[in-house]
Amino acid sequence: MKVLFAVNNENISTLIVKKYQKEYKEIISYKNVYYFNAILKELQKDKSYDRIVISEDLEKFTNSNYQQMDKFIFDRLDSISDEASNLQGENIPIILICSERRAKGEEILVKLFGIGVYDAVIGKDRDISEVCNLLNRPRSKKEAKEY
């Protein structure tokens, strides 16, 4: 499996890969990028990724206005989801590790569901095991709606 990681700490992606490979006995090849625009560029260049893991706090915000931050995140993920398709034209699942402040049912999560981001990890699920589970088997639309 090939994974594009966009998390603000390389140790996180390394821990996820090690745990996944140990648990599922499958090798992961991966690349780390550190900006939202770098995700777009990488997806335009390489359509062979099987999964994308993005941390909501990938980039630091100078503004503490949550509405503006949510708009920025949504706009970036909207662009990324448009590019996130493989050579067969199928959507590449995006696993979003949400910030600590997120709660189920928030407007931004509903909007992300609308653009096909079904694998948001929030609250107590924000751990490496849950990310590994979603790497192995991303949520269906129905499962995401229930989550």
Predicted segment positions?
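Long, basic/Gly/Ser/Thr-rich N-terminal segments
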Residues: 1-146
